[in-house]
Amino acid sequence: MKRGVAIVGAVTMIVASLLIRAHLDEKSTTGSTGTADGHSSIVCITELADACRTAYGNDVTVEDATTTAKRLAKGGTDIDAWITFSGWPELLAADNVSPALDVKAVASTPLVIAAVKQRAAHLDCAANGWSCWLDAIGKPWSSVGGDATWGSVTVGIPPYPSGTGLLVQGSAATAYYGSTDVGTNDPQYTASQVALGKASQDPNVLFNFISQLPARYSAIGALQADVAAQQGAKADQIQLFPLTPPAFATAVVARVAGGDSVDAGKLAKPLTAAGWTSPVDSSGMPDGGVLLALSGI
């Protein structure tokens, strides 16, 4: 009898230990354990993944901006801090999302149009920004001053759900309107959306532009620091055009109310090393309400 009780007790202890181990493993895989920075949940947009991991360790969660924004919009409380671009916290504020985000700007880089230098030289309006390039999409190069062998004008942009994708949409809206005061009821807003609809959304737009230059895209929307870091030996074949009005990607640390604090200074170091500069006062984006409409959240 005692032997039977002992066996049952031993089995119970083994099962209990396995359940505890499974629980710990689950916490580890879901990211609910502490990170290398000592915080329970830091979420980072895909574009800033390398800088985030350098700053806060490999346990940060990396996902596209829209995924995190939707979680926060639904009242997600499992996030202490969201490392993203300015514009995203503003659109959540416009949606009256609670808890509120405490935002600290860290570093900025211009949003630019990177174009095939040889071909851009034949497009008279190339320096005018989005309104020029988007309106030219699909036109034969021979009809806009280029060579017939180049085919048609093509433009690539990051996918809308990405952190940069929202900035591209916002900058296009301001370009067509002429200022950041654009509203969703303005015809220029609609025109910018129609024009962007002709561009190719590509999650690897910068890599494909550079690796297949000059064939894949005539021009793309990108972050200046990223182009500088990846262009390599093809730098002399690429021309960068600042946007009109100017637009910037500003990396921010957005702390969720009640969440653990995150040292923004740690993020500034890898971004500065990657060519980012001190944060600008204005990102050149429309207001949060317009960005909310563009996001589709």
Regions found by a protein language model. Name each.
Residues 47-49, 66-69, 87-91, 119-121, ...:
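Solvent-exposed loop/turn segments at secondary-structure junctions
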Residues 128-142, 155-161, 251-284:
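Bilobed periplasmic-binding protein/Venus flytrap-like ligand-binding cleft at the lobe interface
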Residues 171-243:
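Ligand-binding pocket segment of bilobal, Venus flytrap-like solute-binding proteins
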